[in-house]
């Protein structure tokens, strides 16, 4: 079970809302979000309702202002708890749509897709085990996308505007 608390003001001040499960619409509970405390679990928060817009991965810890989670604004409108995973992590990445082309397999974090696989774009992928976060830039920076087990036949399937990928990280409570 997870627990996340959203605060309207920085430094955990102002009106707050505690959440322990997925919530597709946080708008009724607060008008803005400037700080977050994650007491347990790993979470993905979204700038728009229904898990749309920019995504941000949060694990246990304190985030006293939205820059701490690399947010672009104080708008957080939905969240989901990422189920814990205790087994192996495995993903296949492809340089073409529809799970075609050059295939490479990952079982651990990748700080630079370009350095490791000589790719700057991933056009499709298949998450076989565990949940992952895809980052548009190396060193786990830039836009983030949650990848749960399943096939993603094109970059639009994971919500990206293009196939640019810089790094990939396993969703784990501790790093």
Swiss-Prot record:
Keyword Repeat: yes
Keyword Repeat on entry: yes
A GO CC term attached to the entry: nucleus
TM region positions: none
PROSITE patterns assigned: CRYSTALLIN_BETA_GAMMA (PS50915)
Region of interest (Connecting peptide), residue spans: 84-88
Biological processes per GO annotation: lens development in camera-type eye; lens fiber cell morphogenesis; visual perception
Residue ranges of domain Beta/gamma crystallin 'Greek key' in the record: 2-40, 41-83, 89-129, 130-172
MF GO annotations: structural constituent of eye lens
Gene3D superfamilies found in the cross-reference section: Crystallins (2.60.20.10)
Keywords: Cataract, Eye lens protein, Repeat
InterPro entries (alphabetical): Beta/Gamma-Crystallin (IPR050252), Beta/gamma_crystallin (IPR001064), G_crystallin-like (IPR011024)
Matching PANTHER family: BETA/GAMMA CRYSTALLIN, GAMMA-CRYSTALLIN B
Disease listed for this protein: Cataract 39, multiple types: An opacification of the crystalline lens of the eye that frequently results in visual impairment or blindness. Opacities vary in morphology, are often confined to a portion of the lens, and may be static or progressive. In general, the more posteriorly located and dense an opacity, the greater the impact on visual function. CTRCT39 includes lamellar, anterior polar, and complete cataracts.
Domain notes: Has a two-domain beta-structure, folded into four very similar Greek key motifs.
Binding partners and assembly: Monomer.
Function field: Crystallins are the dominant structural components of the vertebrate eye lens.
Family: Belongs to the beta/gamma-crystallin family.
Name assigned to this protein: Gamma-crystallin B
GN (gene name): CRYGB
